[in-house]
Amino acid sequence: ATAPEVRKLRALLRQRDALREDVQRTVNRLEKANSTSTPQEVIRSLERTKSWLNEELARIEKLITDHTDNDPGLKADLDLLKSIKGVKDQVGREMLALLKDGMFKSASQVAAYLGLTPVEKTSGSSVRGRPHMSKTGPSGVRAKLYVAALTASRWNKQAKAIYERLVAKGKAKKAALGAVMRKLVHLCFGVLKTRLPWDENYVATA
């Protein structure tokens, strides 16, 4: 069963994402209202709504930070995840909530769940087009991993090697970043399993 502190973290992260969507929707409505003949009363209402949503979002963000800082187990896990170059608080907390759920036995299962496994378009017996990510699973986590992969492909020695090798082979940059995202998932899974911080110079041996 999932530990209560992990369930709480997941719930807080979901609420934060929902609030972010609400903020964006309100901003869009406000922009539309300001460009049309919308009554000032409605515009003021939207402005108050946006202000309240931003305050609530900041409050939830603080609750998330406090929760992971004040729980010794979560803090230790988050520190392990953040030892990986490219993994910072945002993606670290998402991966923490996902990996500590207990439903994954391997990093490959996590990558498949997040839709990071390459698939090929097929038509009859022929393969059409380049392989692409399946993009199943939660898009919010995938989006944060993508941002982390952009950083890792420049500053993380292991991730950079994968990225540069694939681009040199003629792979599309987006496909190379997809491979970096998978690598980050494997690294995150690895540090939590071994309880050892990431070692940039570690080379896996067969």
Model-derived segments and their meaning:
Residues 1-80:
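Long, charge-rich intrinsically disordered scaffolds of nucleic-acid metabolism proteins
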Residues 1-11, 34, 38-41, 129-132, ...:
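Short, solvent-exposed helix-loop connector elements
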Residues 168-206:
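Basic, amphipathic alpha-helical segments enriched in Lys/Arg and hydrophobic/aromatic residues
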Residues 83, 89, 94-169, 173, ...:
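Phosphate-backbone recognition surface of nucleic-acid-processing proteins
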Residues 11, 45-48, 52, 94, ...:
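Amphipathic alpha-helical interaction segments
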Residues 60, 73-77, 88-92, 158-159:
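N-terminal alpha-helical segment
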Residues 22-25, 59, 154, 158, ...:
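Intrinsically disordered or highly flexible coil/loop and linker segments, enriched in small
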Residues 13-16, 20-23, 27, 31, ...:
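Short, amphipathic alpha-helical segments that act as regulatory/interfacial helices
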